[in-house]
Structures are given as structure tokens and as C-alpha cells.
């Protein structure tokens, strides 16, 4: 049996495609999460659909300090399957995933993309604190792994960004959609993909109003963290992530996506019916996100 570890709805979408590539193998799926809203619950069920067995693990969003560490320490008591042939995961630096793997055995390790972080220089998913306090925490929760130890075990990486250099050299491309797209296009629709880039609700609302005045999008697809709405903006309220929303409801439309630098844009960049228009924000702390655009062959549609 193989082990599939997921932390986000996008990872479930990718995981399902990977599982399709192994039709004669059984999978045990685990969905981690601190906020179990309708979207996460839906995608946990989507993971369970393609696995012979599965479980969900609540990572305790509201727990802090020692209570949080105790919850992680108790993870070993929830593990029901101990031995696996192959393990698949995206988040090498997750303490939860590292601790889970510390209490099971496996023969081979495979990874897959955690959004566009895999193709940018100095990705967060390879970062791990080296402090004494962090080492004490790992010892307390029973985590025997590190990013470096796991990275050295990677046999292959599955990527939805085959045209870009990945942090893992041995890659196998996968597609999130049916490559035989031949629907007749009937109209055009545009979206702005929400990203709360500022610290306060008021600042983010002001940014959306500014976008509305300067960018001609039809609909706004909110980020899960955006628990506010702006009058006059046409929001898409869906339990699906945007990629799935496109595949299920807009297969016969040309889609224009406006975005700052959302992973959604990179996930759909090569889709034949999708046009990506990157918007450069003037917010100082996010300028580094645009530094790699020339190397990635990306251009800015508009600056605001």
C-alpha cells in the first residue's frame, strides 16, 4: 500500500492525478488541516474517493504553545497503518508530515508541487529553522526527520509546471486537465483571483476597490482568508478551488485571469483556453515575487 499525504485542496487535485497513474496500487490517504470548512471537507472526501482507506487529521488551528505541541505528540496514536511501499507528499518542511513519517516505515519517497513555490528561487518549502529551540520541539513531538533528510530520499517529483526548472531535478510532468480539450469556445469571461496582501481587512478592501476601478474583470474569486465582501464586486461563492471551478463549469469559455502572483495562474498557465494577465502591485514587501518573472518568461499586464 502507498501513503498519500495532503495539506491543501490543490494538493488533493494533484494527488488524484498521481493516483490515476497507479491504477493497480492501493493508497491510504491522509488530509491534514486546521480549518475544516466546507471546502477542506469537500476535498478531504475527494481524496477519500480514490483511496482504499483514508483519515483526516485536525492540526488544531486555535491551539498554541504547549497545547499545540501535545496535539502533535499525540499524532502517533492516530496512525493505523504502519508500513508503506511508496509515500507521496508536497510539504517537506511540515512538522506534522515529518512527525507522521517518523512513526511509519516506507521504501520510496515521491513529492509533488505545492503550488508555484516549487519553481521560484529559495522556496519556503525547503526552509527549516536551525535553532536549538526548534530541535527541542522536534525531539518532544517525536520528529526524526528534517527537510534535508527527506529531500535526499526523493526518488521522483511530479510537477504541473514541466516548462520550468524545479527544485527537484528528476521530474515527471502531470496535467490537471484532460489534454484532449476540443470544445468549441462560446464566449469569454474574466476573473480576478483574490489575494489578501495587506495586514488589515480595511487595507485589503481598499485594494479590491482600487482593482475594481482599474481592472475590467467580470468576477472576483476570493481567497479562503478573505472573510469580507466589497459592494459592487461580483463574487464567485464556490466550495471548489478555482482550477476545479474552471474544469467543471467553464470548459467552453475563454477565461481571462487577472492576478498578482497566485499559484492559480501558474497552474493554468498552459491551459489552451486560459489567458493570464499579471498585475504588479506597488506594495513594497511583495516586490520580490516579481523579480523572477523575466527568468520565467512572464510579463506584467498592468501596474497599480
Swiss-Prot record:
UniProt entry tagged with the keyword Flavoprotein: no
What is the species of this protein? Haemophilus influenzae (strain ATCC 51907 / DSM 11121 / KW20 / Rd)
**Alphabetized InterPro entries for the sequence:** Glyco_transf_52
Q: Which UniProt keywords apply?
A: Glycosyltransferase, Lipopolysaccharide biosynthesis, Transferase
Please list the GO biological process terms of this entry. lipopolysaccharide biosynthetic process
What positions does UniProt annotate as the active site of this protein?
Answer: 223
Official protein name in the record:
N-acetyllactosaminide alpha-2,3-sialyltransferase
Q: What is the catalytic activity of this protein?
A: a beta-D-galactosyl-(1->4)-N-acetyl-beta-D-glucosaminyl derivative + CMP-N-acetyl-beta-neuraminate = an N-acetyl-alpha-neuraminyl-(2->3)-beta-D-galactosyl-(1->4)-N-acetyl-beta-D-glucosaminyl derivative + CMP + H(+)
The record's statement on gene disruption is: Disruption of this gene results in persistence of sialylated glycoforms of lipooligosaccharide but a reduction in sialyl-N-acetyllactosamine-containing glycoforms.
Annotated CMP-N-acetyl-beta-neuraminate binding sites: 221-225, 242-243, 262-263
**Superkingdom field:** Bacteria
